[in-house]
């Protein structure tokens, strides 16, 4: 996964789709397209992500 990829969190479907805006090591900062959720971090031990085709 890299900056600009569209992702979603299968364990938290209410978050919807997000875009990776920053990557540090194996952690990714996600800007959620739903303005209600803002930004959050994902990575090992945090939030599971999968790419949106």
Regions found by a protein language model. Give the residues of each.
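Basic/aromatic-rich interaction segments and small domains that mediate binding to polyanionic partners
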Residues: 2-53
